[in-house]
């Protein structure tokens, strides 16, 4: 009799995705981040669900409801900090996953890559709205500054901002709709994850060497299930170290002050994982130009596959491209640092140079490096 996991309609899907899936035998720990991201998403949905049971989306009580969760709800503090720091872990895994995609040329799987970009935008929107909900000073002013960027759109900008706000400023209507959207977007992300996986399994995974691995595949279970569980243990360990020892390490002290529309914080800045994009936004003196640069900083990823000039897929055997990749990583770290600094000399010029370098590496230097490497190998 054939095993039920190979015949039952539901079990068959799970079997073909997580058990009998033919997987390249040489994929490294950099391929662990997909499963870690799925874990983070599930964790965020579950902790968020419990937080939503106690949260009130009213400007007068939102801040107090967070205090109530931390002080009066059983294990409310740990749920709240797991959710807040879980978001940070989510973005660490997300950026590592994307970095691996660029380094090993996984972006040549166009459908998977493009769905990944849509997923990234969905998760960024979710995280931004979640940051507004505690209704602290940085929540309020962050929401005001970022939603105000829509006013840079010619002709319809002002109307659009007021439509998003549900009034003439960030207020109760804004908070309520942000809660609704913050609740629903992760489920959209979950659906997109399924599509992402569907497209990936149409072609099969890439591997570090970037060459076709059809001749050397092994079943996903038990080899990669064990490997993923190890990654999972490390992720949970780091998350719990953060939650239990320094839960506010990655947060902003200003968010422990209730939102006050009459008092602007000295430095308005988003969460650390958006600082690189915020630095790019601020590096352009023109409002519309800044908004376009902000959008392009993410959307530029969509044209990376079109700019692949090398005859090799992966950067494993391409030293010039490797140097450029690590320069890009260093540049993004610099942008993240600049995004958290005040707008004054020398930070302004450093931010502008780092922003130019970011786009130059992706759009100019990497394609040229690919062509140089081809000519070195006489291809």
From Swiss-Prot:
Needed cofactors: heme b
Domain of life: Eukaryota
Residues involved in heme b b566 binding: 97, 196
Sequence positions that bind a ubiquinone: 201
Matching InterPro entries: Cyt_b/b6_C, Cyt_b/b6_C_sf, Cyt_b/b6_N, Cytb/b6-like_sf, Cytochrome_b, Cytochrome_b_C_euk/bac, Cytochrome_b_N_euk/bac, Di-haem_cyt_TM
Pfam families the record matches: Cytochrom_B_C (PF00032), Cytochrome_B (PF00033)
Gene Ontology molecular function: metal ion binding; ubiquinol-cytochrome-c reductase activity
SUPFAM superfamilies documented for this protein: a domain/subunit of cytochrome bc1 complex (Ubiquinol-cytochrome c reductase) (SSF81648), Transmembrane di-heme cytochromes (SSF81342)
Record field: transmembrane: 33-53, 77-98, 113-133, 178-198, 226-246, 288-308, 320-340, 347-367
Assigned GO CC terms: mitochondrial inner membrane; respiratory chain complex III
Keyword Iron: yes
Binding site for heme b b562: 83, 182
Bilayer topology annotation: Multi-pass membrane protein
Single GO biological process annotation from the record: mitochondrial electron transport, ubiquinol to cytochrome c
Localization in the cell: Mitochondrion inner membrane
Keyword hit for Iron: yes
Family per record: Belongs to the cytochrome b family.
Known partners and oligomeric status: The cytochrome bc1 complex contains 11 subunits: 3 respiratory subunits (MT-CYB, CYC1 and UQCRFS1), 2 core proteins (UQCRC1 and UQCRC2) and 6 low-molecular weight proteins (UQCRH/QCR6, UQCRB/QCR7, UQCRQ/QCR8, UQCR10/QCR9, UQCR11/QCR10 and a cleavage product of UQCRFS1). This cytochrome bc1 complex then forms a dimer.
Protein function: Component of the ubiquinol-cytochrome c reductase complex (complex III or cytochrome b-c1 complex) that is part of the mitochondrial respiratory chain. The b-c1 complex mediates electron transfer from ubiquinol to cytochrome c. Contributes to the generation of a proton gradient across the mitochondrial membrane that is then used for ATP synthesis.
Record's miscellaneous remark: Heme 1 (or BL or b562) is low-potential and absorbs at about 562 nm, and heme 2 (or BH or b566) is high-potential and absorbs at about 566 nm.
PANTHER family for the chain: CYTOCHROME B
Listed name of the protein: Cytochrome b
Originating organism: Odobenus rosmarus rosmarus (Atlantic walrus)
Name of the encoding gene: MT-CYB
